[in-house]
UniProtKB/Swiss-Prot annotation:
It comes from the Bacteria. Gene3D superfamilies: Cytochrome P450. It comes from Enterobacter agglomerans. This is Uncharacterized protein in aroQ 3'region. InterPro entries: Cyt_P450_sf. GO terms for molecular function: heme binding; iron ion binding; monooxygenase activity; oxidoreductase activity, acting on paired donors, with incorporation or reduction of molecular oxygen.
Amino acid sequence: MQLHELMDPDYSDNPFPLYRKLHQQGPLIPAGDKIIISGSHAVVDALLNDRRVGKNYMESVRVRFGDDAAGLPLFQGISRMFLVLNPPDHNRL
């Protein structure tokens, strides 16, 4: 499984073949440097509810678009959005 498969137009048209592939490859699938994908609802639910797990949005921008991209206004703005914040900032609402 590669991260770019999620960006493929075929995925948008019919995601089910990729979903099958995710389930066949197991609960945690490496998809790039420091990127793990899961097609398991139970695994994703457990991770989202585990306070030890966080996300690093800007690191994912650097990996995907290069070091300079993290300084672009677009990514700086997104990095302050509620959905990409970790606790305690995410919990303030």
